[in-house]
Amino acid sequence: MTSEKRVVVIGGGLAGLRLANRLGPAAAVTVLGEETHVPYNRVLLAEVLAGRYAPEVTALPAPGPVLRRGVRAVRVDRAEQAVHCDDGTVAPYDTLVLATGSNAVLPPLRGLFEPDGRELPDGVHAFRTMDDCMALSAAVRPGVRAVVIGGGLLGVSAARALAARGAVVVLAQQGERLMERQLDADASALLATHLSELGVEIHTECRVRGVTTTASAPPAAPARRSGGGAPGNAAAPGQRRVTGVELADGYRLEADVVVLACGVRPRTGLARAAGLEIRKGVLVDDELRTSDPRIHAIGDCAEHAGQVYGLAGAALEQADALAAVLTGGSAPYTGTRALTRLTLGGAGDGSLDLAAFGETTPLPGDDVVRLADATRRTYRKVVVRGDRLVGGVLLGELSTVGALARTWEGGEAPHDLFHLLTDDGGH
């Protein structure tokens, strides 16, 4: 790509910055980052909330190209090939890349929004951005009652982080088990046991109907009840404050803090307004190109071959693939084989590592090999279809995950399944 080609990237997260850095100084790249923070790795926010990492540890490598922080793209004019920004500036492009990411899903719960329909009651938090993380950190003290709504990867991460901060945590999951998308029933049960030992109370098959609130105390009131939010984090006059979560069966969970961890939704507003083709995400082909040949999309906002990944690994792979396309490469993007990894910290050596990939629930006719050690609290399972490894899940001991993932990604025929699950990784 020559320096005359103007590339504008909307989004200063993992995908956008990876692409900009891959293109390098030879390309005239402008990155529009909506957040004012130094770009950060969203994957590490739970560690910041838990108090294990300082926010600056999450910083992403500074891009060589121009990064405009705190600038929001408000309109894409495809005819004039320009992006209009909220500060009144206009960024012309030859190639536009949408790396707008995703938003936290706000479920349709009774009482969730203030009367204006936009603001959440004080004490109710999403957990998606650094601002969300900082607001939660300010609100949580030992003894604070926290309810996490959602038992997927995000909800589990938030629950253990809050428990590490000394909060009294309840996790409400509508499904039958935790992390249903990644874990089988046995692995999920082990995860639930570990979280319980960290102090998290778990409710599965539990549908939340609404949040309960009360009018905030007058600003002149000097007292703050024990375990409340940090000074300066009080609700504004007239704003309501959360007091609990109401379940569909009528049961009520008392809460000082409620965390919404109900998944994410691709941010497609700009693309939709520009007339690009949208389904779940912004539709892209094998060159990550949208329905407009001058516009590409990568990361959480992109939908490729019917799949919206919403994972860091896929965002990075798509950024690398697009960088190759824009610099003259011809290898198509064929999708990402996503591997999920998570470490749940505990006291002393009581942490739990888990990894999952591919299809962890077997189909009829599949072969399954399991190794479980209740004493060591380890669990390993692989699913084989025909002569191919199609998925696996590991908890407690991940020394073999590299060899398993390579076999899975390469489509190799595993010759000795038991050996592949042992500590030497099959070598």
Question: What is each of the regions a protein language model found here?
Answer:
Residues 2-67, 161-182:
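Beta1-alpha1 glycine-rich phosphate/pyrophosphate-binding loop at the start
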Residues 2-7, 60-145, 219-230, 246-248, ...:
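FAD-binding core/adjacent interface of flavoenzyme oxidoreductases
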Residues 3, 12, 301-398:
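Mid-to-C-terminal Rossmann-like scaffold of FAD/NAD(P)H-dependent oxidoreductases
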Residues 11-14, 128, 149-153:
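Glycine-rich Rossmann-fold phosphate-binding loop(s) that bind the pyrophosphate
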Residues 67-84, 91, 165-284:
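A Rossmann-like FAD-binding core segment of flavoenzymes
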Residues 119-141, 219, 231, 235-246, ...:
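FAD-site-proximal beta/loop scaffold in flavoenzymes
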Residues 135-183:
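Rossmann-like NAD(P)H-binding beta-loop-alpha module
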Residues 251-275, 350-427:
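C-terminal catalytic lobe of FAD-dependent flavoproteins
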